[in-house]
Amino acid sequence: MFRGATLVNLDSKGRLAVPTRYRDGLIEDAAGQLVCTIDIHHPCLLLYPLPEWEIIEQKLSRLSSMNPVERRVQRLLLGHASECQMDNAGRLLIAPVLRQHAGLTKEVMLVGQFNKFELWDETTWYQRVKEDIDAEQSATGELSERLQDLSL
């Protein structure tokens, strides 16, 4: 499971160093193979260990290519999916088209989200966190049943 937010840097070739606390697990569980694609709802990237991505692919394959909405989701997620192999130094090369989509330049937030990571431009990430906190503090609506059961 991946958790926490870590600032990492992209080098001039578009590579980022995976924090050491994740490297051994990614090598053990995925042989250092990951898949990066766009997030279709937010200006960030999604980075999955290959076994986790294969589960997503299976789910996507069950969608109908005749349904325009389902086909659009398939096209966006699969069409942007790029395999990334962690090198001996623990670095991943993020494809230029993906970096451009998320506005990634130098400082990048690697955010653990259970079975995957999100990659955010640092400034965009902190803006998003502020917006989310503001929204929660001003929320007056009913919580979903699942959120009501969440006790922190």
From Swiss-Prot:
InterPro entries for this protein: MraZ, MraZ_C, MraZ_dom, MraZ_N, MraZ_sf, SpoVT-AbrB_dom, SpoVT-AbrB_sf
Record's keyword annotation contains Transcription: yes
CDD domains: MraZ_C (cd16321), MraZ_N (cd16320)
Domain SpoVT-AbrB residue range list: 5-52, 81-124
UniProt-listed Gene3D superfamilies: Transcriptional regulator MraZ domain
Subcellular location, record wording: Cytoplasm, Nucleoid
PROSITE patterns: SPOVT_ABRB
Gene Ontology CC: cytoplasm; nucleoid
Transmembrane segments: none
Annotated keywords: Cytoplasm, DNA-binding, Repeat, Repressor, Transcription, Transcription regulation
Main location: cytoplasm
Gene Ontology biological process terms from the UniProt entry: negative regulation of DNA-templated transcription initiation
One MF annotation (Gene Ontology) recorded for this entry: transcription cis-regulatory region binding
PANTHER family tied to this protein: TRANSCRIPTIONAL REGULATOR MRAZ
Name of the protein this chain belongs to: Transcriptional regulator MraZ
